[in-house]
């Protein structure tokens, strides 16, 4: 055991099983046929590996011998608890019932109403529990709706390593918001851009910097600021009238109208990364429209044409305040405040939201550029936070006196020979030159070193440990080893080429 260091003992026990094979035909039809076109490939692939590999589904134990968990309420089940993935999904229903009770709602309207859609947003390591085991429970009980979709995500890594809360290798949201309360949407945007919808992805602060600077600031922020500043400058903040439309104007307005529908389709396909990109496309279109038409130059020669250009730019601005709402709600609210509009139903997105003469307000900067110092600070903070994480190392032992310490005779020794101790997987019998004699030491390092690996190694030896027999071999001392959090052992080898017999003090 990595936790206790003790050797596991094989024992007989009794468990209760869920006979998954009984539901093989139901699941193959429901998952692989009925959802072949609308479920993600990674979900279908995992389900297929369970349903079609070998003899198909096999019975799976639904009980455990543990001292924590939900007790099994059956005769003869003393000491048994429910397998967590039998119990945990049922907790979804219990949580809904409690929420409904607290808020005067009917929980059955969510779990038993065929008009509702049950969607499991999960990580890829929990696909089978939400696409196979939980649906079996719902189906067998009866009266519950089955999941409409299980859009499982792949893994998100962080700065070249896996996220680990135990090692504190994480970006903690509450800490981020304490440091940057005005940068909520910047983090949301970056995370959605790199969402691991189809493959593993990685969050880095350099990526965050690039997304904020190159996309949010240079495209979205630049367009919004330019459209509103020019409106303040030319029309005292009032929306100008729209005149005759060119082919380019008509295409831009057609794109503005089509984008919300595409966003909705992508959202309902659970392609949130593409949906956000589609919303940002409207900002790109607006940015390009102003850059191509250069109203700041054209105003000197054709002010009427500029009125139409600015009207269209403001319509795009107002629509960005609507289509960005699902992704960047803080930013969308600011944009609506700039143009003086309220939050509107989605079916109004893509339409003309502003009338000639409507008042707009002077803008503020939506996104501040992220500099290299910000990135370096966050990476340093991430690394610096690791020592504060919980470790598996034991606490410091009680203090001992210097006199007691000096009683230990610790010296360098060289391993001359090594063989495995019969019928002992962990033990090596070592022949060690200690500088003053050659002695036999039995050491529990066989799971970490092969006999041929240790010959010639200079190691630390506790010399005056009382001899004792281990598996019939008298051991005359102890090899001192270093151990890491994972329980792996390593020799403590001197930095310089010291000879056997040198004292360690």
Language-model-derived ranges and their functions:
Residues 250:
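Gly/Thr-rich phosphate-binding loop signature of adenosyl cofactor/nucleotide-binding cores
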Residues 332-406:
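Intrinsic disorder at enzyme termini
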Residues 1, 70-74, 111, 163, ...:
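Short clusters of hydrophobic/aromatic residues that line enzyme substrate/ligand-binding pockets
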Residues 2-233, 277-279:
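Structured secondary-structure scaffolds
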Residues 148-152, 336-338, 429:
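Beta-strand segments within the central parallel beta-sheet cores of soluble alpha/beta enzyme folds
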Residues 132-137, 315, 319, 458:
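Short amphipathic alpha-helical face segments that pack within enzyme cores
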Residues 387-505:
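Phosphate-backbone binding interfaces of nucleic-acid-interacting proteins
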Residues 195, 206-245, 255-359, 462:
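Helix-rich, typically C-terminal accessory recognition domains appended to large enzymatic cores
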């Amino acid at each position: 055991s990595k936790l206790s260091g003790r050797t596991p003992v094989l024992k007989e026990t009794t468990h209760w099983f869920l006979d998954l094979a009984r539901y093989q035909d139901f699941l193959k039809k429901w998952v692989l046929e009925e959802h072949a076109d609308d479920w993600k490939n990674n979900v279908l692939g995992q389900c297929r590996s369970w349903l079609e590999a070998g003899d198909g589904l096999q019975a799976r134990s639904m009980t455990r011998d543990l001292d924590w968990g939900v007790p099994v309420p059956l005769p003869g089940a003393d000491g048994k608890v429910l397998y967590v993935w039998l119990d945990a999904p049922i907790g979804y229903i219990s949580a809904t019932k409690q929420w409904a009770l607290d808020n005067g709602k009917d929980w059955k309207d969510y779990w038993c109403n065929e008009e509702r859609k049950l969607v499991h947003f999960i990580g890829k390591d929990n696909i089978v529990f939400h696409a196979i085991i939980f649906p079996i429970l719902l189906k067998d009980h009866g009266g519950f709706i089955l999941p409409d979709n299980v859009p499982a995500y792949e893994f998100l890594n962080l700065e070249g390593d896996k996220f680990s809360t135990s090692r504190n290798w994480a970006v903690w949201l509450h800490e981020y918001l304490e440091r940057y309360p005005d940068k909520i949407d910047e983090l949301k945007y970056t995370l959605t851009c790199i969402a691991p919808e189809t493959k593993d992805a990685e969050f880095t602060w350099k990526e965050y910097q690039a997304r904020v600077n190159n996309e949010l600031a240079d495209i979205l922020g630049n367009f919004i600021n330019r459209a509103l500043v020019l409106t303040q400058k030319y029309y005292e903040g009032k929306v100008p009238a729209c005149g005759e439309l060119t082919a380019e104007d008509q295409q831009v307005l057609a794109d503005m109208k089509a984008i919300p529908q595409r966003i909705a389709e992508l959202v309902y396909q659970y392609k949130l990364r593409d949906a956000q990109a589609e919303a940002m496309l409207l900002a790109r279109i607006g940015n390009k429209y102003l850059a191509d038409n250069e109203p700041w130059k054209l105003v000197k020669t054709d002010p009427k044409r500029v009125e139409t250009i600015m009207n269209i730019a403001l319509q795009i601005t107002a629509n960005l305040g609507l289509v960005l709402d699902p992704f960047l709600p803080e930013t969308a609210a600011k944009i609506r405040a700039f143009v003086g509009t309220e939050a509107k139903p989605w079916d109004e997105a893509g339409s003309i939201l502003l009338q000639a003469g409507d008042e707009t307000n002077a803008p503020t900067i939506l996104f501040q550029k992220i500099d290299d110092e910000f990135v370096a600070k966050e990476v340093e903070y991430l690394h610096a936070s690791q020592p504060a994480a919980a470790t598996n190392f034991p606490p410091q032992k009680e203090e001992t006196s210097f006199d007691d310490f000096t009683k230990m005779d610790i010296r360098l020794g060289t391993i001359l020979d090594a063989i495995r101790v019969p019928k002992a997987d962990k033990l090596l019998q070592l022949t060690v030159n200690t500088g003053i004699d050659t002695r036999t030491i039995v050491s529990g390092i066989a799971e970490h070193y092969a006999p041929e690996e240790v010959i010639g190694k200079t190691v630390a030896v506790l010399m005056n440990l009382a001899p004792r027999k281990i598996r019939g071999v008298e051991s005359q001392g102890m090899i001192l080893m270093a151990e890491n959090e994972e329980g792996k052992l390593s020799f403590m080898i001197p930095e310089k080429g010291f000879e056997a017999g040198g004292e360690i003090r």
